[in-house]
């Protein structure tokens, strides 16, 4: 017999549905994601730390879950909100149903609610704090109180919470349909040594760097610039991650040192915002952010439109860009800044996710540009 669940927003709106995950209470910022596929990649993306994810596509769970599709070692989203959970997961790769997957990691989830209504509320009022309660004791008053108590993501440094505790090497390339996940590559196949800061890095980013010949040393978020320079890298990568970039002063200061030393730097998502802050720009909290795999972005240099994967609630403010930063990409949804490039240093960044997972690969050539900068710097 299905257990009940409820979602309460901080404005007092209540949604009643059925539990599809673990029993318990979960609090976070409620956001909506418009991706039709890739729910497992979304749930395991560390960028969703302290967020409750609403998926707007009505049927979620059709393909079950598989360990090969995880973007990190565990689910980082605080909870999941969907319209309908299919009774059958049809996929030859599936290892576990979505419901069992949520329960195995003690994640709450709610289904059978009007996700279109919820999305309209978030779109019109902005991202709200919320609380999911699942199980036998559904206390609306308690849920509302907990939603109102949640401090919100502005000013919250989450990168140091989700980062790796110790540095490690990564040499595994991308998954293929024919071979699955490959064995680690030999150093002879990886001519470029790149230090990757883990602010909440997705595995597919690391794999796409390896595909292009990068031998990765992945380091904790608070690793000093001096420790990184001692590794003698050919380039530095700044990963995606959750929370507000402004409190990440350790990363901002380290990035300033890399820029002063002329090292090639490539940032994605939070890493993009870190590069902007290190270069003198400012960041802002967005009304409801960008979350989905169908976002059109204009490449200003090539005058073409890309369809991209997005997941961010903060953005670099184009109005604050200093003279040494030029805009390279803008969102065609709201005109917000999507990409920057230093005019005086081999450093650039992109707000979206060129590694996709899930999503299109239109922006994947950005990885190639990073390799070009490394080659030019090494010449």
From Swiss-Prot:
Residues 193-379 form the Glutamine amidotransferase type-1 domain. Residues 1-189 are annotated as: CPSase. Pathway: Amino-acid biosynthesis; L-arginine biosynthesis; carbamoyl phosphate from bicarbonate: step 1/1; Pyrimidine metabolism; UMP biosynthesis via de novo pathway; (S)-dihydroorotate from bicarbonate: step 1/3. SUPFAM superfamilies: Carbamoyl phosphate synthetase, small subunit N-terminal domain, Class I glutamine amidotransferase-like. It comes from the Bacteria. The keyword Amino-acid biosynthesis applies. Its EC number is 6.3.5.5. Keywords: Amino-acid biosynthesis, Arginine biosynthesis, ATP-binding, Glutamine amidotransferase, Ligase, Nucleotide-binding, Pyrimidine biosynthesis. The active site is at 269 (nucleophile), 353, 355. It catalyses: hydrogencarbonate + L-glutamine + 2 ATP + H2O = carbamoyl phosphate + L-glutamate + 2 ADP + phosphate + 2 H(+). InterPro entries: Anth_synth/Amidotransfase, CarbamoylP_synth_ssu, CarbamoylP_synth_ssu_N, CarbP_synth_ssu_N_sf, Class_I_gatase-like, CPSase_GATase1, GATASE. GO terms for biological process: 'de novo' pyrimidine nucleobase biosynthetic process; 'de novo' UMP biosynthetic process; glutamine metabolic process; L-arginine biosynthetic process. Small subunit of the glutamine-dependent carbamoyl phosphate synthetase (CPSase). CPSase catalyzes the formation of carbamoyl phosphate from the ammonia moiety of glutamine, carbonate, and phosphate donated by ATP, constituting the first step of 2 biosynthetic pathways, one leading to arginine and/or urea and the other to pyrimidine nucleotides. The small subunit (glutamine amidotransferase) binds and cleaves glutamine to supply the large subunit with the substrate ammonia. Belongs to the CarA family. Composed of two chains; the small (or glutamine) chain promotes the hydrolysis of glutamine to ammonia, which is used by the large (or ammonia) chain to synthesize carbamoyl phosphate. Tetramer of heterodimers (alpha,beta)4. This is Carbamoyl phosphate synthase small chain. It comes from Vibrio vulnificus (strain CMCP6). The lineage of its organism: Bacteria, Pseudomonadati, Pseudomonadota, Gammaproteobacteria, Vibrionales.
């Amino acid at each position: 017999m299905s257990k009940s669940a409820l979602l309460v927003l901080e404005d007092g709106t209540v949604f009643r549905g059925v539990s599809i995950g673990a029993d318990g209470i979960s609090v976070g910022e409620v956001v909506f994601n418009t991706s039709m596929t890739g729910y497992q990649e979304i749930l395991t993306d560390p960028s969703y730390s302290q967020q409750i994810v609403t998926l707007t596509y009505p049927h979620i769970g059709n393909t079950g879950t598989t360990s090969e599709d995880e973007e990190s070692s565990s689910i980082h989203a605080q909870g999941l909100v969907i319209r309908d959970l299919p009774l059958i997961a049809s996929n030859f790769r599936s290892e576990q149903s979505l419901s069992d997957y949520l329960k195995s990691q003690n994640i709450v989830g709610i289904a059978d609610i009007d996700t279109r209504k919820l999305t309209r509320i978030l779109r019109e009022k902005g991202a709200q704090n919320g609380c999911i309660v699942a199980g036998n004791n559904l206390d609306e008053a308690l849920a509302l109180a907990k939603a109102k108590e949640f401090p919100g993501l502005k000013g919250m440094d989450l990168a140091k919470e989700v980062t790796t505790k110790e540095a490690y090497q990564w040499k595994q390339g991308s998954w293929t349909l024919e071979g699955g996940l490959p064995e680690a590559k030999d150093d002879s196949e990886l001519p470029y040594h790149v230090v990757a800061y883990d602010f909440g890095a997705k595995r597919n980013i690391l794999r796409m760097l390896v595909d292009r010949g990068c031998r990765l040393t992945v380091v904790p978020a608070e690793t000093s610039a001096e420790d990184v320079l001692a590794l003698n890298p050919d380039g530095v990568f700044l990963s995606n991650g959750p929370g507000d970039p402004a409190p990440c002063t350790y990363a901002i200061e380290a990035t300033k040192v890399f820029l002063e030393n002329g090292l090639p730097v490539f940032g994605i998502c939070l890493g993009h915002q870190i590069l902007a802050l290190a270069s003198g720009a400012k960041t802002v909290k967005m009304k409801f952010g960008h979350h989905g795999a169908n976002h059109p972005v204009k490449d200003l240099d090539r005058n073409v439109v890309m369809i991209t994967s997005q997941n961010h609630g903060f953005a670099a403010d184009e109005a604050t860009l200093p003279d040494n930063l030029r805009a390279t990409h803008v969102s065609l949804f709201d005109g917000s800044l999507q990409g920057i490039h230093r005019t005086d240093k081999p450093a650039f960044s992109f707000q979206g996710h060129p590694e996709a997972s899930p999503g299109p690969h239109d922006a994947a050539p950005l990885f190639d540009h990073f390799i070009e900068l490394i080659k030019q710097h090494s010449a």
